[in-house]
């Protein structure tokens, strides 16, 4: 590991005049091309300071705090403006989770890095509205929760309900949600309110390894484990009535379904394959990275293009996953309430990605530049009238879906112009872990967590009991602080808040 700072890390971090914005000055690590920008309030900064203090007690540890990772990313070839950390930031593989970094497509040395996307490619969130209210589901809450748990395949080894062969899988990996529409799992209008219309145009299944396909072929339409979930939620607060109305949300206690899932084993294998290829190719392109977890290759190289094509395929797989679970959720609600999903107004409000790299146009130094924007644990936040925002939301900006934890709030935000200027049109993605999974298991009580959920009248079904502690609210930062930090900084606007009444986990 190179680049251990000679002076205390805090010496390189300074508060700016802008609300909730700190800067990491050049010099924290060698050869920083740009500054680091961190969006945190005082409370969240304390968590980062604690992470730094732990690291400085043992600098020979393999653990790197998020602040160091943000600085390390700033050394990568072709990066522009800043390496950006959002308030839910925490240490990850190479790039921290909650990091945004953009690379100039016109710079032949500019890179793409799988660590800047993550292993769960296109891990993301979908929100489905209904015309039901809490009083409609309360008498049937346990029955509905159990039926959803029975319908949606969950857990590490779960297998999907979609019977898929190699030919079908290749077709699906190339078409994304268009495949779901063709097969009858999605409504046509679903894809219109989905980031990129639910289809990555980079995708080419020929660049997905046989091993990755074998892992994916049985997992299509599954939730998975870890922090993935399906929740029945109710609207708790409405902050922006006009924007909420455009999304079909008009009253408190309206029932929604939130699905958080990704590309499962297929995406993980694609990331693993790419990291191996890039570690081998860095010598060829004379790239030296400060941390081997930042393995990368020039965007326009053969290896870079191969990764983008495979990554696009994983993105499509993830959109199919969320689409097929939408199909199952609609079936479950239809069965319990004896009405069609259409009669229940079970329309997709939006579907966003939290782990992705995409070619976008942004202003840099007054000029429009084509950039490869890496968002890892962050959400696109485009403003009103942006051409990539769906027609339904042209007047309010892109909906931004922020998942909380199984005992706390989730949020819907909207994008704005400040984000385009400050963060490449990006904002936070969730609460962000505060405790490691091991620490959660060792310090939290299974029964205590269950009792707290019961006190809040939250129904829960979980395939693996250890996940109760790992995913407990105490394991995460306060999502309200995270969202408010972004709102106060002006990089996203609060629209409405949801609270869970039923949680299904792997």
Curated annotation (Swiss-Prot):
- The yes or no answer to whether the keyword tRNA processing is present is yes
Copy out the cofactor comment. Answer: Binds 2 manganese ions per subunit.
Could you tell me the keywords of this UniProt record?
GTP-binding, Ligase, Manganese, Metal-binding, Nucleotide-binding, tRNA processing
Q: Which cofactor does it need?
A: Mn(2+)
Q: What general EC class does the enzyme of this chain belong to?
A: ligase
Q: Which residues bind Mn(2+) 2?
A: 123, 260, 354
Give the domain of life: Eukaryota
Reaction catalyzed = a 3'-end 3'-phospho-ribonucleotide-RNA + a 5'-end dephospho-ribonucleoside-RNA + GTP = a ribonucleotidyl-ribonucleotide-RNA + GMP + diphosphate; a 3'-end 2',3'-cyclophospho-ribonucleotide-RNA + a 5'-end dephospho-ribonucleoside-RNA + GTP + H2O = a ribonucleotidyl-ribonucleotide-RNA + GMP + diphosphate + H(+)
Kindly list any coiled-coil regions of this protein.
none
Positions with a binding annotation for Mn(2+) 1: 120, 123, 228
Q: Please state the Enzyme Commission number of this protein.
A: 6.5.1.8
Q: Which InterPro entries match?
A: RtcB (IPR001233), RtcB-like_sf (IPR036025), RtcB_euk (IPR027513)
For this record, an example GO cellular component is: tRNA-splicing ligase complex
- UniProt binding sites for GMP: 227-231, 354-355, 403-406, 410, 429-432, 505
Residues of the active site are 429 (gmp-histidine intermediate)
Give the similarity note: Belongs to the RtcB family.
Give the function comment from the record.
Answer: Catalytic subunit of the tRNA-splicing ligase complex that acts by directly joining spliced tRNA halves to mature-sized tRNAs by incorporating the precursor-derived splice junction phosphate into the mature tRNA as a canonical 3',5'-phosphodiester. May act as an RNA ligase with broad substrate specificity, and may function toward other RNAs.
Instruction: Spell out the HAMAP family in the cross-references.
Output: RtcB_euk
User: Additional info?
Assistant: Ligation probably proceeds through 3 nucleotidyl transfer steps, with 2',3'-cyclic phosphate termini being hydrolyzed to 3'-P termini in a step that precedes 3'-P activation with GMP. In the first nucleotidyl transfer step, RTCB reacts with GTP to form a covalent RTCB-histidine-GMP intermediate with release of PPi; in the second step, the GMP moiety is transferred to the RNA 3'-P; in the third step, the 5'-OH from the opposite RNA strand attacks the activated 3'-P to form a 3',5'-phosphodiester bond and release GMP.
Q: How does it assemble?
A: Catalytic component of the tRNA-splicing ligase complex.
Q: What is this protein called?
A: RNA-splicing ligase RtcB homolog
């Amino acid at each position: 590991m190179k680049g251990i700072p000679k002076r205390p890390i805090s010496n390189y971090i300074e508060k700016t005049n802008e609300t909730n914005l700190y800067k990491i000055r050049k010099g924290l690590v060698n050869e920083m091309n740009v500054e680091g920008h961190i969006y945190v309030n005082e409370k969240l900064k304390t968590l980062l300071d604690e992470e730094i203090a732990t690291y400085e007690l043992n600098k020979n540890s393999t653990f790197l705090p998020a602040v160091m990772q943000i600085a390390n990313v700033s050394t990568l070839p072709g990066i522009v403006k800043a390496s950006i950390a959002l308030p839910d930031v925490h240490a990850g593989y190479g790039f921290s989770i909650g990091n945004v970094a953009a690379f100039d497509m016109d710079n032949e040395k500019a890179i793409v890095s799988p660590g800047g996307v993550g292993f769960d490619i296109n891990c993301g969130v979908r929100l489905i509205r209904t015309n039901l209210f809490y009083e409609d589901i309360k008498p049937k809450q346990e029955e509905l929760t159990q039926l959803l748990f029975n319908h949606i395949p969950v857990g590490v080894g779960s297998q999907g309900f979609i019977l898929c062969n190699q030919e079908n899988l290749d077709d699906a990996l190339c078409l994304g949600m268009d495949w779901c529409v063709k097969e009858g799992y999605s409504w046509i209008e679903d894809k219109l309110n989905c980031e990129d219309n639910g289809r990555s145009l980079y995708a080419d299944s020929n660049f997905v390894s046989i091993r990755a396909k074998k892992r994916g072929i049985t997992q299509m339409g599954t939730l998975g484990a870890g922090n993935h979930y399906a929740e029945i939620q109710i609207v708790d607060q409405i902050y922006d009535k006009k924007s909420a109305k455009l999304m079909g949300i008009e009253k408190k206690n309206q029932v929604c379904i939130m699905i958080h899932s990704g590309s499962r084993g297929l995406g993980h294998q694609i990331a693993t394959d790419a990291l191996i290829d890039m570690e081998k190719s860095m010598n060829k392109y004379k790239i030296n990275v400060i941390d081997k977890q930042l393995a990368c290759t020039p965007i326009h190289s053969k290896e870079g293009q191969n990764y983008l094509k495979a990554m696009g395929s994983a993105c499509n797989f993830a959109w199919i996953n969320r689409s097929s679970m939408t199909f199952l959720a609609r079936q479950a609600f239809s069965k319990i309430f004896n009405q069609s999903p259409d009669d229940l107004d079970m329309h997709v409000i939006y579907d966003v990605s939290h782990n992705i790299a995409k070619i976008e146009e942004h202003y840099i130094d007054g000029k429009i530049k084509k950039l490869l924007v890496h968002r890892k644990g962050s959400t696109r936040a485009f403003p009103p009238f942006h051409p990539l925002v769906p027609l339904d939301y042209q007047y309010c900006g892109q909906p931004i879906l922020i998942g909380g934890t199984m005992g706390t709030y989730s949020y819907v935000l909207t994008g704005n112009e400040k984000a385009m200027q400050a963060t490449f049109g990006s904002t936070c993605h969730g609460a962000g872990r505060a405790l490691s999974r091991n620490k959660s298991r060792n310090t939290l009580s299974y029964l205590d967590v269950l009792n707290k959920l019961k006190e809040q009248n939250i129904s829960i079904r979980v395939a693996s009991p250890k996940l109760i502690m790992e995913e407990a609210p105490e394991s995460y930062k306060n999502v309200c602080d995270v969202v408010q930090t972004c709102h106060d900084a002006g990089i996203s606007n609060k629209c409405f808040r949801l609270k869970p009444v039923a949680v299904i986990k792997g």
